[in-house]
Design a protein with these regions (language model features):
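Structural motif
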Residues: 20, 55-56, 83-84, 104-107, ...
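Conserved anion/nucleotide-ligand pocket segment
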Residues: 106-180
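N-terminal glycine-rich "phosphate-gripper" loop used for MgATP/nucleotide binding
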Residues: 56-67, 72, 88
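Short, acidic/small-residue loops that bind anionic groups at enzyme active sites
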Residues: 73-101, 105-112
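Generic secondary-structure signature for well-ordered alpha-helical cores
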Residues: 16-20, 50, 99-104, 130-141
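Residues at alpha-helix caps and immediate loop-helix transition turns in enzyme cores, especially N-
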Residues: 3-7, 69, 98
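ATP/NTP phosphate-donor binding region
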Residues: 1-53
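Short, charged, surface-exposed secondary-structure boundary motifs
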Residues: 33, 95-96, 116-121
Length: 180
């Protein structure tokens, strides 16, 4: 399910979309929480923001312990080197902190590992590319959803039709702050 080798198909998916994928210095480190140390994760985050060849940063996965990073993040460095940073679930702790401390936009969206999904990938890719590459676009809801373990290719996926109810029809624009 997890680990570097199991997620290489995510790299292939992103490369097939025309992206050059690189990995942080401490990407292969793993402790008892399937993470690396706070020091290593912060160093990797800072290195990615400081590197002019990096245009975007994808969180590897949600990261239930991502809140540990908050006191150690160099928000001045991030403000001076704005770039796309995207993740979901518990990654929203540092996404919202970066927005709050720097004003830089952050993206609640797929993590690197979710690009290994075989089913449900078409909608994810289209929605993500719209957010990453367009200044404005129409947000089109997915026609289906699933809460299956997408990360486990041995488990069957069961998609359900999306049922939408409009409470107040119209258009809106503005800043959305969300999270887990």
């Amino acid at each position: 399910m997890g680990g570097f080798e199991a997620n290489l198909s995510a790299k292939e998916t992103l490369e097939n979309l025309g992206f050059r994928v690189s990995f942080s210095e401490h990407y292969l480190e793993s402790d008892m929480l399937s993470s690396s140390s706070i020091k290593s994760r912060v160093a990797d985050l800072h290195a990615a923001f400081a590197d002019d060849s990096v245009d975007a940063i994808l969180a590897t996965i949600g990261g239930f312990n991502s809140n540990e990073l908050l006191p150690y993040i160099d928000y001045d460095l991030i403000a001076k080197h704005p770039k796309i940073i995207c993740g979901y679930s518990d990654s929203t702790a540092f996404l919202n902190a970066i927005f709050a401390k720097t004003g830089n936009l952050t993206y609640m969206g797929p993590s690197y590992s979710s690009f290994k999904m075989k089913e449900g990938q078409d909608y994810q890719i289209k929605a993500w590319l719209n957010a990453m590459t367009k200044s404005a676009y129409d947000l089109v809801p997915s026609q289906e959803w699933s809460s299956d373990p997408w990360y486990d290719p041995t488990q069957p996926r069961h998609f359900m039709p999306t049922e939408w109810k409009i409470y107040n029809a119209g258009k809106a624009s503005g800043t959305i702050i969300g999270g887990n």
